[in-house]
Amino acid sequence: MSGDIEKNGTVKDADIDNNVSSNDANSVSAEKFADVISTVDTGTDGANDVCGGTLYLVSTPIGNLADLSSRAIKVLREADFIAAEDTRRTGRLLAAIGVKQPMTSYHEHNKKESGERIIKRLMAGESCALCTDAGVPGISDPGADLVALCAGRGIPVVCIPGPCAAITALAVSGADTHRFVFEGFLPTEAKQRQSRLAELSREERTAVIYESPHRLKKTLSELRSACGGSCKITLCRELTKLNEEVIRTDLDGAVSIYSEREPRGEYVLVLHGADNKKTSISDWSCITVAEHVAFYEAEGLSRMEAIKAVARDRGVSKGIIYKELIK
């Protein structure tokens, strides 16, 4: 299948990592953006009020500063303090919108200690705005643990919706969007990775996967081995930025494209459902138990994992499958 490559050369790029501006004529400068948001009506009916003792999950741009909502700006301005995955990166965002609220660090490596400190401040009546580097806190980013702590203490949590790379990619993918599963980043540990790839090979729903440029080629090759070269995939790169690119192809085409070019930027992969994949496990009734187990072993599962998978497919216990194998 030939690749359908769609490049967006008119997306306004205001990359926060590049001082929140660009020299391109289509970019949104921090100054112009500040002028725009100063005129935004953030509501006076009380629905947008920032309340004490509340955690706010503030969605931030995934590449284009203009995607930051007026409600998000209001919360960042009025919260007592801001918890940030990376205080330097969030600091650049805050500078662009003229916000000078105090910040504290909350990330994957300090979330236990920092989380308890944030909880104490929330219980004392302060309001906190949680920001990650990009997108919605808790979605493949720090935040879920803090929300769980709040839930356990009866602390209100409010999400301020906004940009999300997974949903943005899904929307432009051309795949079935009625049912989908978010995988995030695939495991790096070999056994877990092979098990996840085997699951994807029989997944009927559209699957959304995050990948970094230095692992993209390996992941595409492994997906092709697991799902078959004819399985459709949409690759989304640099979403919402000036060099946004959407490639609609199949896994054979994707591997071919990236054999001739080096990946650049962060990727969202949208893998189409199991009806496009090389083998349908719904055909198990036509094969023997041994053949069924061999299928999963060929997909990278260990003997025991394969037996568990076959037992699940056939609705019987692992013991029955094991006895059938040793007959």
Language-model segments: which ranges?
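A contiguous loop/helix-start segment that scaffolds small-molecule binding in enzyme catalytic cores
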Residues: 2-4, 8, 33, 52, ...
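Glycine-rich, flexible N-terminal cofactor/catalytic loop recognition
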Residues: 2-9, 31-109
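Loop/turn-to-beta-strand initiation segments
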Residues: 54-55, 126-128, 206
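Short active-site oxyanion
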Residues: 76-82, 154-158, 206-207
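Short beta-strand scaffold positions
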Residues: 84-85, 141, 210
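Glycine-rich, highly charged phosphate/nucleotide-binding loops
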Residues: 110-118
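Glycine-centered tight-turn and secondary-structure capping sites
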Residues: 142-146, 303
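Class I SAM-dependent methyltransferase SAM-binding "motif I" and its flanking Rossmann-like core
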Residues: 145-203
